[in-house]
Amino acid sequence: MSQFFEYKDTIKEGDLVLAWLSRDNLKPITVKAGEVFNTRYGAFSHSDMIGKPFGSQIAIRTKGSNRFGFIHVLQPTPELWSISLPHRTQIVYTPDSSYIMQRMECNPRSRVIEAGTGSGSFSHAFARSAGHLFSYEFHEVRYEQAKQEFKEHGLLEAGNTTITHRDVCKDGFEIKNGDTTSHEFRGPEETKVELNADCIFLDLPAPWDAIPNLTSVISKEKKVNLCCFSPCIEQVDKTLEALEEEGWQDVQTVEIQGRQYEARRQMVRRLDDAIERLRDVKRRKHEGVEKRQKNVEQTSNNGSSVEATESDKDLKHTEKTHFNPFGKGSRVKEGDSNFEWTQVSKVELEIKSHTSFLTFASKIIDRTRDEEQTKAYLATFKDEGSKLSKREQRRLKAQANKDIQKE
C-alpha cells in the first residue's frame, strides 16, 4: 500500500519522508541507513530517522559551538508533496485541487481522466480519493519520469492508477493493447480498457481539441463532471464554445485566489500615552541642560583636571522607565495580562498558488436522443446567429439543447 494512502507510525528504511525546513521549504528524502541529509542547519544522518515516529524533530549540535540545528520528518501526503516535488511543469496547488475535487464530486467510486500529468501533483490527490485514475501525458520524457515516480510511491502497485503516453487532442483517450501505457493487458490483442469515466480534468493548452474525443470514454450510466484548467481567458472562451457544441450543461468559470493571513496581538496605544511621552522627553531634556550647565560651572571654577562629577555619570546612565508603547522601555511579552491588547492581522502581498481559470461543466448521456439531429439543430443557430454576440449565441444553443431534450 502506498504511503500516500495510509498513515504509518514509525519511519522504516526505504520510506519516503518529507524534511520540514520551513513553511515553504520541504525536501523529499528516501531513508537509507548510512546516508546523510545535508542542509544549512547541519548534516542529519538517515540512521537517526529510522525508528522515529513521523512528525519527530531531529536535532544535531553544530560543530564548534553550542548551537543546535533541527528538522521535522513528516509523513508524505498529496498536499505536502505539492510543496516539495521536483517541478517539471507548472502544478495545481491545494487551493485549486481541493475545490476542483469537491465540485466534480470525486469519491472512491469515481473513475477519473486526467489529461496533462505534468509534475504529478494533482495525480497523487486523485489517486488517493478516486476509484481509478487514468492519466495522460504527451511528452515522452515527462511520461517516463512520472511513471517512475508513481512506481516508487506505490501508486501503480495499488492498482488504481494508469498512466499513458498519448496526445489526447489528436489520438483520443481510448487505451488499447499495444499502447505505451502502464496498464497490464490480459487476453486477446484487440483488448481495450473500458474507461467509463465520470470525472474529467483537462490541463491542456488547447482543451477544445480534446473535448470532442470524450464522447466514447465517458460514463453512459450517470452524470459526468468536467473541469478545464486554463491560465488565459482566451482559452476559456474557446473552451466554452467547444463544450456547448458537444452538449455539455451547467457551464461555469471560476478563479481561486488563496492568501495567508498572519494574526497577532498588538498593544493598544492611547493618546494619553503619547502626550505623557512628549512630556517625559521635554522634562529629561531640561534636566540634561541644567546638569550640563552645573558641570561647566564647576569645571571653570576648579580647573580642567577635575574628574567627572556624579551628574556626568547620571547623564550617561539614565534610569530605565516603565514600559512605553511609543518608545524604549522594559520588554513586555505579547499578551501580558497587565496591558490591553487588540487582535490584528496582515495578508501576504503575493499569491503563491498558480492561479488559473477553472471551467466546470456536466453532462448526462440521454440514450433516447438522436445526436445527429442535435448537431444539425445546433448548426442552424450557428448559421443564423453568426451576427449575434457570443453570449446570445450561447443562450440560443443552451435553449436548443433543452428543446431537444423535451422532444
UniProtKB/Swiss-Prot annotation:
Residues 310-322 have a biased composition (Basic and acidic residues). GO terms for biological process: tRNA methylation. Pfam families: GCD14. The keyword Transcription regulation does not apply. Its EC number is 2.1.1.220. S-adenosyl-L-methionine binds at residues 119-121, 137, 142, 167-168, 203. Its main location: nucleus. It is found in: Nucleus. The keyword Ribonucleoprotein does not apply. One of its GO terms (molecular function) is tRNA (adenine(58)-N1)-methyltransferase activity. Residues 296-308 have a biased composition (Polar residues). It catalyses: adenosine(58) in tRNA + S-adenosyl-L-methionine = N(1)-methyladenosine(58) in tRNA + S-adenosyl-L-homocysteine + H(+). Residues 284-335, 388-407 are annotated as: Disordered. GO terms for cellular component: nucleus; tRNA (m1A) methyltransferase complex. It is an enzyme of class 2 (transferase). Keywords: Methyltransferase, Nucleus, S-adenosyl-L-methionine, Transferase, tRNA processing. Heterotetramer; composed of two copies of TRM6 and two copies of TRM61. Catalytic subunit of tRNA (adenine-N(1)-)-methyltransferase, which catalyzes the formation of N(1)-methyladenine at position 58 (m1A58) in initiator methionyl-tRNA. Belongs to the class I-like SAM-binding methyltransferase superfamily. TRM61 family. This is tRNA (adenine(58)-N(1))-methyltransferase catalytic subunit TRM61. It comes from Kluyveromyces lactis (strain ATCC 8585 / CBS 2359 / DSM 70799 / NBRC 1267 / NRRL Y-1140 / WM37). The lineage of its organism: Eukaryota, Fungi, Dikarya, Ascomycota, Saccharomycotina.
